[in-house]
Amino acid sequence: MNFYLKKVEKRIKEKNYDVVIDYSSNLLKYKDFDIAIPVFAWVHFSLTFGEQLSADKIEKYKKQYKKYDKILAICDTMRNEFVDILGMDKTKVELVYNPINLKVIREKAENVNPDYEKYLKENYFLQVSRLTQQKQPEHLVDIYYKLKQRGIKEKLYFIGNGEKVELIKQKIKEYNLENDVILLGQIENPYPFFKNAKLFVHTAKYEGLPTVLLESLAFGTPVVAYDCPTGPKDILGGNSEYGELIPLNDKDMFVEKVYELINNNEKYENYKKISLIRADDFSMESNKAKLKELIENTNF
């Protein structure tokens, strides 16, 4: 056991904590790490990322997680992985969402940088993420091009940076979308853009529990997203109750659902209203109450 973990062990014993919550899922792999209180692993990633796990990998995960008193999963899909793949008892794996501070982000949305005011006056679709292979942002340019051919007027904004920027620029040039697809780069406070967006659009090929979807719901901004492993289904509902869920990598379906949504005012307004209600399920208050209940019901 390294020096850092020895310090952690000493501090835990000195402070007489009730529970330790391990975000790394690595704390209990050290045999000489010895504390006599419950330890929860709060898992923020998929075990599979949509891939088939090898027998060796499954066995490794079983050994790693069986030592914990509770597993906290941030979405139902992850929770099911522990039960279905690792064979864990359902009572040991609890659902505790990654919370968002609704009050703070809504306050930040009112603080508008004058440099961005002209962009916020436009009608636009929004994507906020690292522009990487995982997020597949180039899919959105292809989708947007087809929507432009069908007559939509909204622009498409990207907030973020990453290795896919050059590919996006190439596609923008290829499709002659220089005036319609805007790369805004990294922005310290993106929340005014969340608040004013017509739609939030998301084409990742895998996720954990994507915070950007929750932040969109917090402003009543309807979401259209790929049904990737894991997260979007847990947020938007398996039957698209809280936003449009699109089969993974189905660009044509994505085009159809976006076009339908912006031309169906009743459906659009319903998503705006229900998004705000859904966001409350992921609030700090809801998750604090859940954690408090779990700790109080743990046998010490």
Locate the predicted segments by residue.
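Membrane-proximal helix-turn-helix segments that form the acceptor-binding/catalytic region
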Residues: 6-11, 54-73
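Carbohydrate-associated surface elements
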Residues: 77, 99
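A conserved mid-protein helix/loop that constitutes part of the nucleotide-sugar donor-binding site
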Residues: 123-146, 152, 163-169, 252
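Aromatic "clamp/platform" in nucleotide-sugar-dependent glycosyltransferases that forms part
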Residues: 186, 205
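Conserved acidic donor-binding segment of nucleotide-sugar-dependent glycosyltransferases
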Residues: 237-252, 260-265
